[in-house]
């Protein structure tokens, strides 16, 4: 059986990211699920893809190495919205809300976040409270993890540690725009310890502000992140009626639908998220950057996008 629900959410532009508070529920109970059903579907973004964040590389460390990915004019772009040519909204968390029992979590494997080419990958993840995340530096440049939980009163620091560089890199590697080989530094494992009721976890590099990674903290195993086609799937769901929510760090609030899971059947949901409008963040590209940042042509000429020349045309894939 297939149940199709299509809905949109109007989101006003804002300079803040979404804040998600956990509902007041008891501990999740792991049970053996019999005649469980499944849920699949898609998430699409409707409207113009928002302008990416923009960072002038001459104002930050490692401009030459990190400038291997840039726009050719000294700017590094960070596009929080990963959207395909047909609106497929990738890297969005889809999860059930207020489910108190169901399938076991299974063996825990700490999420691995890589600092590679001066970006944290993946951009969106799911983590568990009181469990580890593992962060690895794959670059010849120094990175620093600053991890926070969000709150209406402001962020709270969870941990702040440096990321070791692999000793296999020659000393001058971090000063070159032509070093593209990656070596793994010593992995750093840190435990996520959230304040009760808070569910949004974020990391940023203390040296390179355009390096971000976000995660929703899960208290049950019924969650997934949309794939390259904006699709999602969950299995072994106990029969019943549930709220299904969609979360992205730069969309205010969560879209919510209700779905009934029948024994042994598959339900389908289609979510359409209206693209946020207006100015979403403080960091954006500016005109006349030479005047504002006193950038000389000599400095700019050293920042060469030898790995990826970034562009933005206001929609679809970059």
What does each model-found stretch correspond to?
Residues 1-6:
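N-terminal secretory signal peptides that target proteins for export/translocation
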Residues 8-20:
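Bacterial N-terminal signal peptides
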Residues 14, 23-28:
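Small beta-barrel nucleic-acid-binding modules, principally OB-folds
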Residues 26-318:
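Extracytoplasmic copper-binding redox domains, predominantly the cupredoxin/blue-copper superfamily
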């Amino acid at each position: 059986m297939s149940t199709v629900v299509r809905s949109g959410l109007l989101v006003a532009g804002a300079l803040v990211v979404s804040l998600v508070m956990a509902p007041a529920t008891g501990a999740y109970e792991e049970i053996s699920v019999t005649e469980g059903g499944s849920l699949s579907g898609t998430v699409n973004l409707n409207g113009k893809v928002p302008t990416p964040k923009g960072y002038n590389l001459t104002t930050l460390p490692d401009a030459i190495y990190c400038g291997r990915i840039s726009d050719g004019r000294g700017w590094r772009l960070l596009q929080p919205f990963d959207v395909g040519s047909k609106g497929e909204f990738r890297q969005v968390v889809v999860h059930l809300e207020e489910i108190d029992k169901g399938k076991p979590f299974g063996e825990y494997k700490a999420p691995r976040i890589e600092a590679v080419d001066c970006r944290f990958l993946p951009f969106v993840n799911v983590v568990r409270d009181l469990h580890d995340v593992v962060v690895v530096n794959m670059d010849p440049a120094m990175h620093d993890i600053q991890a926070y939980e969000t709150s209406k009163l402001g962020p709270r620091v969870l941990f702040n540690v440096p990321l070791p560089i692999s000793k296999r890199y020659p000393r001058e590697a971090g000063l070159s725009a032509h070093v593209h080989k990656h070596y793994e530094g010593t992995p750093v494992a840190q435990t996520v310890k959230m304040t009760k009721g808070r569910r949004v976890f974020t990391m940023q590099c203390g040296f390179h502000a355009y390096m971000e990674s976000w995660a929703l903290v899960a208290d049950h195993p019924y969650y997934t992140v949309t794939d390259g086609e904006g699709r999602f799937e969950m299995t072994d769901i106990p029969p019943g009626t549930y709220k299904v929510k969609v979360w992205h760090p730069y969309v205010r609030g969560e879209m919510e639908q209700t779905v009934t899971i029948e024994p042994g059947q598959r339900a389908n949901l289609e979510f359409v998220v209206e693209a946020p409008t207006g100015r979403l963040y403080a960091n954006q590209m500016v005109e006349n950057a030479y005047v504002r940042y006193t950038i000389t042509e000599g400095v700019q000429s050293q920042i060469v996008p030898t790995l990826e020349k970034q562009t933005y045309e206001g929609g679809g894939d970059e």
